[in-house]
Amino acid sequence: MPPRPSAAAPKNIAVIGAGIAGIACARTLVQSGRKVTVFEQDDQVGGRMSSCETAFGTFDHGAQYFTVRDARFAQALATAPGSYKPWSATAVRVLDPHGRVAEAALRSREPHFVGAPRMDAVPTEWARPLVEAGGVELGTRVTRIERDALNGDRWQLQTSGAGDTSHVFSGFDAVLLALPCAAARALLRASSQSALSKKMDDVEVAPCWSLKLAFPNAMQPTLCTLGPQWNAALSTHHRIAWLARESSKPGRSAVERWTVQASPAWSQEHLDDDEATVLAKLHKAFAEVTGIRAQPAFAEVFRWRNAKTVKPLGQPMLWEAGSGLGACGDWCIGHRVEDAFVSGLELALAVARR
């Protein structure tokens, strides 16, 4: 059950970021009777639990799957039936640096799930009531948090949108940042809110280059799959950490598509390389690992500057009741999808119980 609102708790709240943490936080606050506005700079919700749409089908180029360990996460998922399905963990292999299978399957038999028909189906479903109520501002980047010009006890947000348009949203009792740690820290410092940002200084998050490949010509009656018979693998190749056959996921189209995620170390080393160079190097590594030498009809890379938490904050969230500023995200406690959910939930509970 959502917490019973405290008389002193903030009633009009801004949540910056519409990833899993932001949506979990916002929906919990709405359920407790708060007015919430979510600001998201992208044109869709989901954050790293998002999908890329192409002419050859979708690619889950961020989070690849999620697991469920916290009962509260399981309860929240139950409110969005049909938006996720199990993805067989027995298909996941562990490869040596040359692409040979070193372990037949992951040691853990923990169920793996994916959004259906896209990875962002779960956050999209959770956000639906907020969107329908006009509580989500997509394509809106918050550039500064400052005290409300008309009421110094409240906050206002300076924002930018399409075509360099600017707008001020005001009257917030609390502002909650559900952003990657580096982005949250930068926004707080740009807003002269260094006290909260300093608490994030020790957090470390690694980047990740993601490669998307499509082989539509592989769809032949006598050809079941192209390349390896496994559908997903953890790789020890120096460039590649993960590979997944997108068409093996439930609800996806049959076009042969692969998502490849570079290793944290390689991604960091080549973080500022141009996309063409990264694509060529990762494609070469993909061929070495899978044995697939065919030329893809589609190839594209995407750079996640903040992908996997290396050193978490060590607590579920940050909340300053006195100022009305808070922050949440997977970086607080880990790097899993569920970690983002738990962090957003815990921040909402703390705000509601103020």
Predicted regions and their residues:
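Short beta-strand to alpha-helix junction loop
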Residues: 65-69, 101-127, 272-278
